Amino acid sequence: MIIIPDCSVRSRPHSRTVLVTVAATALAAGCLLAALCLGQPSVGPAAALAAVTDPEHPLRVAVVEVRLPRALLGLVAGAGLGVAGLLLQDALRNPIAGPELLGVSSGATVVVAAIVVLGLGVPLALQPWLALGGALLAGALVLLAIGRTRDPAHVVLVGAAMSAACGGLVVAVVGLGTQGNVVVLFRYLLGSLAARGWPHLETVAPIVGAGLAGAWLLRRRIEALTLGDEVAAGLGVPVVRTRVAAVGLAALLAAAVAAACGPIAFVALLAPHLARRATGTTSTRRVLPLVAVAGGLLLVAADLAARRLLYPVEMPVGIATTLVGVPALLLLRRRRQPRPAVTG
């Protein structure tokens, strides 16, 4: 067994992590209930719960067939994105690593765009696995270009280059499609939970569940990587295999979400940072459950805000997360820049 010492920056009681996780879970449940209540028509919490439990309830179609799968998909997709961000940040020892910044999400998007625009008729259940191929290819190219450097600025530049290249491929694919397919693709590229039903949830949930289980099994080895490659190797951790497995799991999670919801940025970046700040620990194994809950909470809350901000017009959730995520990324980058020395 690999014994990993607690690598928290600050020593805090484990009970704080449990307490914060329980509180975040309660907030996520509240957002789920709010998602069932809001819409046209709006209903109260009691009526929403009655519609879920009563097959004959007049609002059952609106609540159970439209709102419930959308909200549950938000929780599942957010959890997958959050854990994908945690895996990449800890395995690469880079606090601003994420599927959207390493080109992983863009690689998956290219594959799904080709399926949509070219009308290939690929079954929904198969699309995440094809998207995984694009995600793994893009991620592998970025990792090869990064090499051994851990400089966040260099990683962001390489990831931005890969995202730009994938964006160019999407534009090229658009030129081959019909007007109707291009409209569908445009809506997909904005990132949204709208018009998603039980088939989308049934496709994504098992894949995300498998990815979360894999992350849980690797949590101690990934935490060892945060101590440095030499220390991790000294603890008996196969460094290269663990890092490859972590990136592969992150690509799997990001590809599944991208196939069902489109590219949704910055949930993967923010969820791990919020979890670490709330608990006061950087321990991978301690914050992993909280990161999953925080990711789901962020995405469902963002979707609620997107639905109500410009009501009755609905903003795609991908735009809402970007509006919050870009300033957060700039803030994180600014905090990491060393202050100039004072002389004289």
What are these regions (language model features)?
Residues 1-344:
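Alpha-helical transmembrane segments in inner-membrane proteins
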